[in-house]
């Protein structure tokens, strides 16, 4: 069962403001919580990122909006089922090119 989705907006140092603008716009439009802006890789993520937590029933609408409003940013989205490894490998959607994740944290 899917509890919710995470949409991680990836960014480099020169894209922080663009990522903040996208996160703020998603929060204003959909009311989704926006997490901390990590300026360095954290968890399995290969570079700076911020997490949007999206209710399952709202994900379709938010995903469509992110696909058309992300600009040049990459967004990694995944379901939250309780199986962290599967959620980060099998239950994923990439908006933009995919990037390798550090899956060793799930060992």
What residue ranges belong to the model's regions?
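Long, contiguous binding/interaction regions
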Residues: 1-107
């Amino acid at each position: 069962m899917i509890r919710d989705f995470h949409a991680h907006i990836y960014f480099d140092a020169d894209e922080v403001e663009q990522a903040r603008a996208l996160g703020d716009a998603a929060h204003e439009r959909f009311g989704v919580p926006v997490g901390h802006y990590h300026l360095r890789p954290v968890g399995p993520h290969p570079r700076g990122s911020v997490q949007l937590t999206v209710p399952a029933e709202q994900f379709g609408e938010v995903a469509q909006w992110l696909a058309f409003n992300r600009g040049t940013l990459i967004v990694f989205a995944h379901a939250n089922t309780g199986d962290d490894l599967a959620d980060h490998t099998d239950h994923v959607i990439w908006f933009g090119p995919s990037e390798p994740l550090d899956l060793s944290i799930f060992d």
